[in-house]
């Protein structure tokens, strides 16, 4: 049976590991160290570690694999293949070149578009109507290896980064399992990435989280769903942070300055730069838990002044 080392960390990686382990001999799982989580800073294992322990697979958690003693242990396993999916560290050539069939990665974009750590976020931020998964060879340069297989999936207006992560993790697992038989048999010729089409999905900055109400409504709508459920787009209301977790978009145009409020007893609408409307459905005022807009408008939102604007 083919011996595989699997490397991954978040929930996205779990279906890939589970599918691999159902058919192949996964001899080791490498994931990030346990991290403090939440206000109480409880030391919490990554999702992949939990899944690996349930499957009784040995787990390695080096802080920095490149300088870890565990690197030589992994090479000594003499695996046939290394598979990664959102692991979170650049791997040294000594490990990439050690397996018989090399090292491959399950990446959540249609490469060469969106190399980097936030491809799902950027697909939504940019208003894409489709994205997908690419399986490619691992090289030391970030997400730059030749492409082995690729599969597309649509993005709808009802999707956000959370729903797309779920869809892409399942798609990635399916594509990998469909690809491996021919790949291991040497029947697939990998295709180099077109350097003219390379784009990058760098980590989201705090500046990208803040809503600019002078922008078009569609752009703001894409920002809200692209940053949900993490890190969440925000604006300000009476100079205090105000997060918008979920919203819909109305192309109907209204008169009003960017950030102007149109509200009744149960709904809240905000005017964008082009006059179209953002309609928040799940929000989080400063110092409060997240809530549906109806609850807000029948509570603190009742006192919103018609002259109040978001972003001020």
Swiss-Prot record:
Enzyme Commission (EC) number: 2.1.2.9
One matching Pfam family: Formyl_trans_C
Top EC category: transferase
Binding positions ((6S)-5,6,7,8-tetrahydrofolate): 109-112
CDD domains xrefs: FMT_core_Met-tRNA-FMT_N (cd08646), Met_tRNA_FMT_C (cd08704)
GO molecular function annotation: methionyl-tRNA formyltransferase activity
SUPFAM superfamilies, alphabetized: FMT C-terminal domain-like (SSF50486), Formyltransferase (SSF53328)
Keywords for this protein: Protein biosynthesis, Transferase
Role description: Attaches a formyl group to the free amino group of methionyl-tRNA(fMet). The formyl group appears to play a dual role in the initiator identity of N-formylmethionyl-tRNA by promoting its recognition by IF2 and preventing the misappropriation of this tRNA by the elongation apparatus.
HAMAP family in the record: Formyl_trans
Family, similarity comment: Belongs to the Fmt family.
Name by which UniProt lists this protein: Methionyl-tRNA formyltransferase
The species this protein was found in: Listeria monocytogenes serotype 4b (strain CLIP80459)
Gene name in the database record: fmt
């Amino acid at each position: 049976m083919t011996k595989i080392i699997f490397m991954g960390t978040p929930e996205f990686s779990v279906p890939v590991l589970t599918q691999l382990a159902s058919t192949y001999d996964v001899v080791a799982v490498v994931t990030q160290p346990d991290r403090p989580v939440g206000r109480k800073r409880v030391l919490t294992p990554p999702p992949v570690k939990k899944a690996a322990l349930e499957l009784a697979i040995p787990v390695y958690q080096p802080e920095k694999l490149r300088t870890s003693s565990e690197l030589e242990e992994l090479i000594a396993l003499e695996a046939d293949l290394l598979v990664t999916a959102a692991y979170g560290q650049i791997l040294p050539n000594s490990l990439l070149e050690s397996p018989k069939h090399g090292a491959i990665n399950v990446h959540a974009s249609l490469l060469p578009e969106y190399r980097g750590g936030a491809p799902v976020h950027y697909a939504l931020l940019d208003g894409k109507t489709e994205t997908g998964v690419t399986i490619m060879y691992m090289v030391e340069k970030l997400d730059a290896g030749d492409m082995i297989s690729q599969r597309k999936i649509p993005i709808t207006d009802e999707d956000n980064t959370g729903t797309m992560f779920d869809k892409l993790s399942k798609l990635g697992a399916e594509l990998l399992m469909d690809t491996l038989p021919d790949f291991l048999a040497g029947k697939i010729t990998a295709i180099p990435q077109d350097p003219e089409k390379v784009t990058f999905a760098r980590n989201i900055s705090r500046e990208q989280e803040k809503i600019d109400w002078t922008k078009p409504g569609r752009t703001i709508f894409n920002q809200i769903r692209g940053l949900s459920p993490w890190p969440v787009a925000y604006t300000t209301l009476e100079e205090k942070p105000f997060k918008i977790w979920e919203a819909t978009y109305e192309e109907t145009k209204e008169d009003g300055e960017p950030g102007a409020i149109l509200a009744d007893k149960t709904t809240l609408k905000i005017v964008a730069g082009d006059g179209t409307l953002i309609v928040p459905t799940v929000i989080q005022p400063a110092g409060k838990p997240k809530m549906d807009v109806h609850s807000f408008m029948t509570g603190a939102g009742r006192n919103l002044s018609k002259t109040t604007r978001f972003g001020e």
